[in-house]
Amino acid sequence: MPSVKLTHHSPPDTIASDSVRLLSRETLRISASLASPPVDDLPPHSPPPPDSQFLHSTLRLICCEEIDGRRFKYVAESDGSGRFKKNSVRAISLESPQTPFDEVGSFLRSYVVPEGFPGSVNESYVPYMTWRALKHFFGGAMGVFTTQTLLNSVGASRNSSASAAVAINWILKDGAGRVGKMLFARQGKKFDYDLKQLRFAGDLLMELGAGVELATAAVPHLFLPLACAANVVKNVAAVTSTSTRTPIYKAFAKGENIGDVTAKGECVGNIADLMGTGFSILISKRNPSLVTTFGLLSCGYLMSSYQEVRSVVLHTLNRARFTVAVESFLKTGRVPSLQEGNIQEKIFTFPWVDDRPVMLGARFKDAFQDPSTYMAVKPFFDKERYMVTYSPTKGKVYALLKHQANSDDILKAAFHAHVLLHFMNQSKDGNPRSVEQLDPAFAPTEYELESRIAESCEMVSTSYGVFKSRAAEQGWRMSESLLNPGRARLCHVKEGE
């Protein structure tokens, strides 16, 4: 661009014209630089550099985040001296709002296709499910006629309005159960990660449904709503049982005999069910107390269910078994065996309750409320595909995953989070405690947090490989961990780029 000579006296119109052209050219240059950041310097689809994007604003870009295809950028307010104001982090969506049609489509996809579809299944999935849906359509239609026929066979008149009402009520009850089964199927991914916990929770629901069914005897005028509620609960339990059955049988099979193992397992269950039916017929002749009988049978059912899932030995590490393994390693230097790890796994925890002290794959807004904390922690993880931090207000350790994180990075992030939790517990009272005992009131200073993170980084660099090798020696399949991380991924933007 030619230099502008200030001593040259041009006519006013010429000076104004030159100024306009110069201003327009500079505006276009700045706009182009903002719209097209250098590909080699910035991550793909990265937002514009913070200094240029907020040139005349106190807001500064910290990082960007992607979750389920939606992208967000996080900004914080500067106080003018280069420091950030506390609790000034704000999330700005980079996506236009979804139309109602798109929202309905996303809602339906979350129920009828697996996560990651179509990449998570092979090409035969779609034709199989298409024909399966058609089969169930005809089966559902046939069910109405079979129900009416059965009711007529036991004495209900075909032309009676009462029999028609009974048939409709019965069909509505079954329909409500199918709706409940469909709604709970959205939790399908959790069946892979926490199958023991979900299996036991399903058995609890089964007994709850049985109790609601028995309650219809006390309030017969509420038969339909109670029967519908009971059928919903019992169908949810049935989904849980069906979805967790195959992984459990797979753990027993040593070769390509999973079909045989499954068939024999179901046969054992059916034989025991028939024996239980015969037993109930015998004792029902004596007219025992309904409440007492239900209480005793339910206790036996739930105790057997608990011991059933507790006896399963799985070779993979979900969050519960991973916690057992890491805690043992940090305290004793050894990784528990498969039998020990599975026995110590907690069954009375429900995957949909987020009360764990370690949050894996968390969102940025949950992990960081103070932007200065993020800027202080970030340099420790520049060479990693994750980062960990501790939130004193929530009493939890958060592991955030970067966009390129693979399965080993997720495993390492989870290990690092537990190590940091171990150090935070030590800083509180000098004695390492269980991860379930973290005190939310403990609020370390920023310097203390940096010190603990530095210590954890040093320990992870020397002990993570040792942990993996010792876990593999015990038979744990480290390459098939089921840690169920959150779907949020960070895309970092460095200041000044």
UniProtKB/Swiss-Prot annotation:
Domain of life: Eukaryota
InterPro entries: RUS_fam, UVB_sens_C, UVB_sens_RUS_dom
Cited function: Required for normal embryo development.
Family the entry assigns: Belongs to the RUS1 family.
Descriptive protein name: Protein root UVB sensitive 6
Species per Swiss-Prot/TrEMBL record: Arabidopsis thaliana (Mouse-ear cress)
